[in-house]
Design a protein with these regions (language model features):
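Juxtamembrane membrane-water interface segments that cap and precede transmembrane helices
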Residues: 47-57
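Generic transmembrane alpha-helix motif of multi-pass integral membrane proteins
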Residues: 74-81
């Protein structure tokens, strides 16, 4: 069981590090490029694609959110891969993996492969946190005197 736990930590940490690096590989699109790209998907059957484009482009156009997300993915992925900081890395990654899963659940419901992939990442993250429940259960269940 311990080897599976280590493999899950390394897999999730590596995946987050890779995702964080990818946030910095492409240049930020100009606002006019986003508008031109969005205009291609105005048909009713392409509403999901339009929502995805506008959502991701909006995050990139803020000037900071996309970079902060990339830095957090890198940092928390590294924390997850280091033995002593694995629990805190998993805890900090929980909202990020939840967000990624919900993004794919609501904006890409037809892409089953990515939905399963992000669901597995979220489940691994939940599993890593649950495995360390002795560290946090006292915060939820207080014993009566």
């Amino acid at each position: 069981m311990s080897i599976l736990f280590i493999v899950c930590r390394l897999f999730l940490g590596g995946f987050m590090i890779y995702g964080g690096i990818q946030k910095f590989n492409k240049p930020m699109p100009e606002p006019i490029e986003v508008v031109e790209k969005a205009q291609k998907f105005t048909a009713a059957e392409k509403v999901n694609t339009l929502q995805k484009i506008l959502y991701i482009s909006g995050a990139k156009q803020t000037g900071y959110f996309w970079q902060v997300l990339g830095i957090c993915e890198l940092l928390f992925g590294l924390l997850l891969m280091i033995q002593g900081t694995g629990f805190i890395g998993a805890l900090f990654l929980l909202p990020i993996t939840l967000h990624i899963f919900l993004f794919h659940l609501f904006l890409e419901p037809d892409d089953i492969e990515e939905l399963v992939q992000t669901g597995v990442l979220f489940a691994i993250n939940i599993g890593l946190i649950m495995r360390e429940k002795e560290k946090w259960k006292h915060l939820l269940w207080i014993k009566p005197i």
